[in-house]
Amino acid sequence: MPVSVKNSEVLFAALKSAGITLLSALPETWLVHVMQMAESDPDITLIRLNKEEEGVGISAGAHLAGRKSAMLMQNHGLLTSVNGIVSVAQLYRIPLLMVISYRGEMGERDPWQTEGGRITEPLLQSLGIIYRKLSDPATVAYEVRQAQTLAESSLRPVALLLTRDLMWEE
């Protein structure tokens, strides 16, 4: 199963349309095309991370500098970022758009991804983070805009979960 280039293009265009000019990411299979597009786009700064939690600080700095940013990560990266999300983004009211590949849900073929998938939504709920699951490319631009608007108006983290139906071509 290859990652959908077409839907990656839809997602990248939606991020740009929402005014995102800075992306932070660790290499991630489902987001590889989005990262490649960011690297080749002169209007976007892509910062490669050593661990996902660093992206919280980068997004905080971007916000303080007047730039809109988003973190690209897998849901296991969300798990490792909880301390930064709570201690920086929530405590200091930083608008944080998290674009998360949602591994471990229905149809997952990799057993090592299933536990992270099982706890992703309950974790977001326990942190009070509003999220949406994206599966239809026709709604991606709308959902990205809505999520960015909410992050900015609430000064809180917001998450978009990218499903297998959106990111993979069967």
Language-model regions: role of each:
Residues 1-170:
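Thiamine diphosphate
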